[in-house]
């Protein structure tokens, strides 16, 4: 009985090896076929696809970005602020400079965004005052 099982397993193994050896080894695998680039004859060369330099320059020069203001001048309250500021003797350039300064000052003093240390470092900050306790620690940008 043992020899019968042994012969059956041996026969199955030999059949499997024969089937594997008869398959065409030289043929490419499916992965290689997927990775190979198809060469199509109807693909245009890169020079035919590219736009002429004059057309490209014409397109790029037509794009003019409007000057970015820190406030919306169409709002009546903003217009009133500008008028009051100019009435005090300042010009609009000075107003824009001051607004940029104070907005930047506010951004830099925001403890949620200000980091004096690498928050992903293995060793935290040394000083107890520099460590920020609370819900905004390390979760500010998510």
Curated annotation (Swiss-Prot):
Reported consequences of knocking out the gene: Morpholino knockdown causes severe defects in the development of the central nervous system, including enlarged hindbrain ventricles resembling a brain ventricular hydrocephalus-like edema phenotype. Increased cell proliferation of glial fibrillary acidic protein (GFAP)-positive cells in the developing central nervous system.
Question: Which interval of the chain is the signal sequence?
Answer: 1-28
Q: Which residues cross the membrane?
A: none
List, alphabetically, the InterPro entries matched. Augurin
Q: Which family does it belong to?
A: Belongs to the augurin family.
Function of the molecule: Probable hormone. Required for the proper formation of the central nervous system by attenuating cell proliferation during development.
Q: What is this protein called?
A: Augurin-A
Species of origin reads Danio rerio
Recite the lineage of the species.
Eukaryota, Metazoa, Chordata, Craniata, Vertebrata
- Give the encoding gene's name: ecrg4a
């Amino acid at each position: 009985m043992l020899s019968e099982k042994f012969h059956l397993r041996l026969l199955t193994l030999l059949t499997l090896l024969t089937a594997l050896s008869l398959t065409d080894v030289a043929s490419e695998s499916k992965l290689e076929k997927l990775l190979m680039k198809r060469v199509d004859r109807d693909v245009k060369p890169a020079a035919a696809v590219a736009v002429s330099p004059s057309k490209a320059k014409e397109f790029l020069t037509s794009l003019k970005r409007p000057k970015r203001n820190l406030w919306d001048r169409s709002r009546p309250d903003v217009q009133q602020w500008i008028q009051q500021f100019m009435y005090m003797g300042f010009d609009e350039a000075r107003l824009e400079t001051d607004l940029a300064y104070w907005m930047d000052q506010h951004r830099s003093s925001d403890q949620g965004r200000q980091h004096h240390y690498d928050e992903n470092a293995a060793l935290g900050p040394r000083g107890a005052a520099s460590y920020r306790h609370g819900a905004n620690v390390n979760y500010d940008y998510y």
